[in-house]
């Protein structure tokens, strides 16, 4: 047990370094910097390259990684945060998430995605402590963290620039009027935070012994969780949150096994969000309650199509593509249609009500496994299983997320992100039902009214019908009285509540609708590919769906179809590698948010 606690403290030490950087940036800019985790991952891989490939001593590699990470943080601030500092929260949130995608996949392209041994420039088991052997590397990591925290505290308390940071965090406008160089202070916060993140990545690699771009980046994500648990904007809370998460992770693995790690980490995070959203040490007003989208991403009006436009599109999509493109183009079309079915209802959730879900892969996974199991275990017909999959996804996702809709702002995004990891953890761990990491194989192909859908052209045309129904339902909802109410909830929730609207209920309803169609898409995916495993439903799927919606226009259902065509169809048709695709997605999101925030299929209001 002692070695488990010490292991938790060592992990928590790294998480604390990452969390401090996240809290520092949030305190100064009010931005939840999702890219901080990727800086940790990139710093870890850069340290491996300096030590293993170039043969540098560890202290020189540490300094080089600190400098390189600081530079990366400065670039992220310059390109994705500073230009959007006056925009609604969704803008910078999505931009930093996109920067995270770019950095993660750039790391995989540069260093390769495989797992490799991390160099051990310092002894790892030469210090006996209470029957457990620690290493000089652990002592150096602890010492660095303590020294960094003490120096940061003293600097913020007594240093001139530190006082400027505190003034900017308290009120940037007032600080600017008093002569504080707010822009320089914001740059400084990114430099310091990124430096801490990169160094934390090296310490993680030294302790873990083996590393890959994904594992290092995930460590950064857990550091973000630690910052939120401790309280965004609180340095002391970030340190405490890091050690709490580290201990919880180690004790959970010790008691239940490594398969439950994500369940413990993100389950605890979700619990803290529900019981004390501002964190253990954070201010109750740290994350402001305001519309996430405002008029920034929702300013455009969707371009309307005449009836004959729809007829022409239906003929081209339904007949020309399978006849002229054959099975290859039809296979691409099925993927486009499935992602469009997920994305179109998101225009209600994100566009109308202003709620950003970073875990939409969760209801997709629930629907996929529900449909596959209903057909394989209970022998239900495909169409009935398809509908039930949507219902199961809507009910389960809504029940699990029901408490989070009382939250505001960034909290909803963070909670849905946690939900995505929790669902994946349950799928991986529930071997008796889901077969865990091995997945479900031999899922029957769809059969509609006695007609089996065996070839790609059949799958594509059926998916197209489901997409058409999805578009019809969402267009009708947007044009109805309910659609008007949802827009009022997203535009100004306080005003909507003052008019007697039960805003939380409308958010829940909108999420249930989006989850229902996501479940349908998951069922289609399961039966058309005949195989499922947890790696299909990663956070990258959720990010891709959100990217599709942003590209097409938050308020444009047909824009979501075009977004799916551009971001799913074109890369698939061009046979781009997965890493290159996600890198492209990140760049597209940043460009759209910066230069065309209303999306492609909209006109300015």
Q: Can you say where each PLM-predicted feature lies in the sequence?
A:
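Transmembrane helix-bundle core of multi-pass membrane transporters
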Residues: 83-84, 89-158, 185, 209, ...
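Single transmembrane alpha-helix segments in multi-pass membrane proteins
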Residues: 2-51, 75-91, 183-184, 188, ...
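Alpha-helical transmembrane segments within multi-pass membrane transporters and channels
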Residues: 22, 55-99, 106, 240-245, ...
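Membrane-interfacial amphipathic/re-entrant helices at transmembrane-helix boundaries
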Residues: 1-18, 46, 53-61, 87-93, ...
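Helix-loop-helix "hairpin" substructures at the membrane interface of multi-pass membrane proteins
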Residues: 12, 133-211, 235-240, 305-306, ...
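Cytosolic-side transmembrane-helix boundaries in multi-pass membrane proteins
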Residues: 18, 110, 114, 170-177, ...
């Amino acid at each position: 047990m002692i070695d488990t606690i010490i292991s938790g403290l060592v992990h928590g030490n790294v998480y604390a370094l990452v969390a401090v950087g996240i809290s520092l940036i949030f305190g100064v800019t009010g931005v939840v910097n999702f890219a901080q985790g990727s800086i940790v991952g990139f710093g870890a891989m850069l340290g491996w390259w300096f030590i293993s490939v170039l043969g540098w001593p560890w202290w020189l590699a540490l300094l080089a990684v600190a400098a390189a990470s600081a530079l990366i943080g400065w670039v992220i601030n310059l390109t994705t945060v500073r230009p959007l500092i006056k925009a609604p929260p969704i803008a910078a949130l999505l931009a930093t998430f996109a920067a995270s995608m770019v950095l993660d996949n750039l790391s995989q392209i540069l260093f390769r995605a495989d797992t490799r041994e991390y160099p051990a420039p310092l002894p790892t088991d030469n210090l006996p402590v209470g029957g457990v052997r620690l290493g000089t590397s652990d002592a150096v990591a602890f010492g660095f963290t303590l020294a960094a925290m003490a120096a940061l505290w003293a600097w913020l308390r007594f240093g001139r620039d530190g006082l400027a940071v505190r003034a900017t965090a308290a009120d940037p406008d007032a600080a600017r009027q008093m002569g504080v160089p707010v822009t320089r202070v914001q740059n400084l916060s990114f430099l310091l935070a990124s430096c801490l993140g990169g160094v934390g990545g090296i310490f993680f690699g030294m302790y873990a012994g083996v590393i890959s771009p994904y594992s290092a980046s995930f460590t950064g994500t857990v550091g973000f969780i630690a910052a939120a648990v401790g309280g965004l904007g609180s340095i002391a809370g970030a340190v405490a949150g890091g050690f709490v998460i580290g201990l919880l992770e180690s004790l959970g693995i010790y008691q239940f096994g490594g398969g439950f790690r994500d369940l413990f980490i993100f389950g605890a995070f979700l619990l803290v969000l529900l019981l004390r959203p501002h964190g253990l040490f954070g201010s109750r007003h740290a994350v402001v309650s305001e519309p996430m989208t405002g008029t920034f991403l929702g300013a455009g009006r969707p371009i309307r199509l005449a009836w004959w436009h729809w007829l022409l599109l239906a003929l081209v999509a339904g007949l020309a593509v399978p006849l002229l493109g054959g099975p290859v183009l039809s296979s691409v079309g099925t993927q486009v249609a499935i992602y469009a079915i997920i994305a179109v209802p998101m225009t209600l959730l994100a566009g109308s009500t202003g709620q950003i879900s970073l875990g939409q892969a969760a209801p997709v996974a629930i629907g996929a496994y529900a449909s596959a199991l209903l057909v394989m275990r209970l022998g239900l017909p495909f169409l009935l299983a398809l509908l039930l999959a949507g219902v199961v996804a809507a009910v389960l996702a809504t029940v699990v997320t029901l408490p989070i809709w009382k939250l505001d702002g960034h909290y909803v995004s963070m909670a849905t992100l946690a939900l995505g990891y929790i669902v994946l953890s349950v799928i991986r761990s529930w071997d008796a039902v889901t077969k865990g990491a091995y997945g479900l194989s031999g899922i029957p192909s769809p059969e509609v009214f006695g007609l089996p859908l065996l070839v790609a052209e059949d799958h594509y045309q059926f998916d197209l019908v489901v997409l058409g129904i999805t578009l019809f339902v969402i267009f009708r909802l947007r044009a109805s009285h309910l659609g008007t109410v949802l827009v009022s909830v997203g535009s100004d929730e306080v005003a909507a509540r003052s008019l007697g609207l039960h805003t939380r209920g409308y958010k829940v309803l909108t999420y249930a609708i989006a989850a229902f169609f996501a479940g349908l898409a998951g069922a289609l995916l399961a039966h058309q590919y005949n195989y499922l495993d947890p790696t299909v439903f990663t956070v990258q799927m959720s990010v891709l769906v959100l990217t599709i919606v942003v590209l097409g226009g938050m308020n444009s259902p047909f824009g979501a179809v075009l977004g799916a065509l551009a971001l799913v169809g074109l890369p698939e048709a061009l046979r781009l590698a997965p890493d290159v695709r996600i890198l492209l997605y990140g760049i597209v999101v940043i460009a759209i948010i910066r230069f065309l925030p209303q999306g492609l299929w909209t006109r300015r209001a």
